[in-house]
Design a protein with these regions (language model features):
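Short acidic/polar hinge/loop motifs at secondary-structure boundaries
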Residues: 1-18
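Short, glycine/serine-rich, charged loops/turns that create anion-binding
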Residues: 21, 41, 206-209
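Outer-membrane beta-barrel domain signature, strongest for Gram-negative TonB-dependent receptors
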Residues: 94, 100-218
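Outer-membrane beta-barrel translocator/receptor signature
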Residues: 8-12, 23-90, 95-105, 116-117, ...
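Flexible loop residues that form catalytic
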Residues: 19, 78, 82, 112, ...
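A generic secondary-structure micro-motif detector
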Residues: 1, 52, 96, 176-177
Length: 218
């Protein structure tokens, strides 16, 4: 889901598992799995914050905080924001595209009811609203040159540069790519250990709304 595109601030580990994994991870894992495990809530207060800045107005802020609520219950809250101006100019509209505008928040509650029973509640929300993504050509092929020789005079302006500047960050689109994705979910985990058997139950619900438009060059 959209979480894969956001900055994960509280990672415990990342596992790359090759080959079919349907027995453990379901039918959509026939080619392998990238398993991302986040940190559990902890019984001691702690946290971190990370701030990054860069070209094109890049601003990335993320943080996580964890701590106890009671003797057996603890929490963890993780959030991040990622913003950046567009750096590729659409010669048709004059707009700057390939921007970033992403947000995410995740909250966990962990309750160790007994030595054998553990309950865990997770709620998360992710959002992306971007004019993204497109690329720039490294060279002009015959089809591109033919298209430009016809369309350019009709519009009264050049639609390509020849030769291409590979670092020019320019494109020509009559429909700009756009991505708007909002996802949210909740899951409840029950772990119960018996003498020779470990029982695990996961009940979850996830909702996603997407508006994705591909760029059109004609």
């Amino acid at each position: 889901n959209q979480s894969a595109l956001n900055d994960l601030m509280s990672l415990e580990r990342v596992e790359v598992i090759k080959g079919p994994q349907s027995t453990l991870f379901g039918k959509n894992s026939s080619a392998g799995v990238i398993s991302i495990t986040t940190k559990l809530p902890e019984n001691e207060f702690g946290g971190k914050i990370q701030i990054t800045g860069g070209d094109y107005g890049l601003q990335k802020i993320g943080g996580t905080v964890t701590g106890p609520i009671s003797e057996n219950t603890s929490f963890r809250i993780t959030a991040s924001t990622h913003e950046r101006d567009g750096y590729t100019k659409n010669l048709n509209t004059g707009n700057e595209i390939n921007d970033r505008d992403r947000y995410s928040v995740r909250a966990q509650l962990l309750s160790e009811v007994s030595d054998r029973l553990t309950l865990r509640l997770i709620v998360d929300s992710d959002s992306a609203d971007e004019n993204c993504c497109t690329t720039s050509a490294l060279t002009n092929g015959a089809a591109t040159l033919g298209f430009a020789s016809v369309i350019g005079p009709m519009l009264g302006k050049p639609v390509i540069k020849n030769p291409v500047d590979p670092f020019g960050y320019e494109t020509y689109l009559d429909k700009e790519p756009r991505t708007k994705i909002d996802t949210s979910g909740i899951s409840f985990h029950v772990d119960y250990e018996m003498e020779n058997v470990k029982f695990k139950s996961i009940t979850a619900y996830r909702e996603s709304e997407q508006e994705v438009f591909d760029g059109d060059v004609d």
